[in-house]
Amino acid sequence: MKHAIYLPNYGSFGDARVLADLARDAEHAGWDGFFIWDHIASEYPIPMVDPWVALAAIALNTERITIGTTVTPLPRRRPWKLARETVSIDRLSNGRLILGVGIGLGAHEWDHLGEEADQRTRGAMLDEG
């Protein structure tokens, strides 16, 4: 059995350097994986880092541990751009990236940004991606 840590990409963890240091510490402690959330909205103004920027820092700060996002809401991303980002991170990490995709959380992460909030539509977008 393998064990991984997962952390948010906001609040105290809204800094790529902090996440990269924690991933290095997790690797040294023997953990198998280090995953971060892919959220973009909060009720409060708090520090937040793009998960792909953070994963680049994590990839360069670790050697063995598997890395990735817990779930990236594919309907919120352009598939070609996400493909380019994941290939880049996978190369930086020497093949240690795992990509989890889904439709994302509730409407609070979508309607504030003018994105599609309907779950059926997001599901169709996930299938298309």
Predicted features along the sequence, with ranges:
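Active-site-proximal glycine-rich helix-loop-beta segment
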Residues: 30, 63, 93-95
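Conserved beta-strand positions in the central sheet of alpha/beta enzyme cores
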Residues: 35-36, 66, 100
